[in-house]
Design a protein with these regions (language model features):
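Active-site-proximal alpha-helix that buttresses catalytic centers in soluble enzyme cores
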Residues: 3-5, 9-78
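Generic beta-sheet signal
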Residues: 6, 142-150
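Active-site signature of alpha/beta-hydrolase-fold catalytic machinery across serine-
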Residues: 70, 157-161
């Protein structure tokens, strides 16, 4: 089996991030000037390292699609598609609200925050299930290099699963805006080459000998 390269990239910083708002699916989000610059830098670094993208799968949220457009301008992927499994967490009525409200609600109900599910919404375990489902599909396919443009919570959930950690380690696996993880998969066990690297770190971590 040939080695696959899978890049997990969180969308760039949004105006809503700057306001401390939990966006979820309730708020599509618009990239800040800094967020756009970060995504352009990530795309340029990957292109300079010689990464040839066979497919780019993208969250349907506007912040994800805007980020993907900036990446695609540098990487010219052969195939770009929206995949609903990469969507942000459906937080129900908590979407668009200050982040601390979810923690307060979980405490009132006496449940771990990753199991909190608002009416009609999702828990973090639900998000993990769909991200893992997409991961399995990508790994079973023939594409050599795939970029997944998603959200911090979903990427953290997937990283917990890949590393065998529980949700008590969730916060340690959440990427910053435009954070990038690079995973090689060529057998039974994935190899994480980079985890949640920042755009500023990338030039010293990627080169044409190692990134493809």
């Amino acid at each position: 089996m040939s080695t696959q390269h899978i890049y997990l990239i969180k969308h760039g910083e949004t105006e809503e991030n700057l306001q401390g708002i939990h966006q979820g699916r309730a708020v599509g989000g618009r990239l800040s000037e800094h967020g756009r610059a970060d995504m352009q830098q990530v795309g340029a670094c990957l292109a300079t390292a010689g990464v040839a993208v066979d497919q780019m799968l993208v969250s349907p949220m506007s912040r994800g699609r805007e980020s993907a457009e900036l990446l695609a301008a540098a990487l010219t992927p052969a195939d770009v598609r929206v995949d609903e499994r990469l969507a942000a967490k459906d937080s129900g009525h908590l979407g668009g609200q200050p982040r601390e409200l979810a923690a307060a609600k979980a405490a009132r109900h006496g449940v771990p925050i990753h199991r909190l599910r608002t009416p009609g919404g999702e828990s973090s375990e639900d998000v993990q299930a769909r991200y893992v489902d997409l991961w399995d599909e990508v790994c079973s396919g023939a594409r050599r290099t795939t970029v997944l443009v998603g959200h911090g919570g979903g990427i953290a959930c997937l990283l917990l699963w890949l590393t065998g950690n529980g949700f008590d380690r969730y916060l340690q696996h959440v990427p910053g805006s435009a954070g990038i993880t690079w995973v090689e998969f060529g057998g039974l066990t994935p190899r994480i080459r980079l985890m949640n690297a920042t755009p500023a770190e990338l030039p010293g971590l990627l080169d044409a000998r190692t990134a493809r």
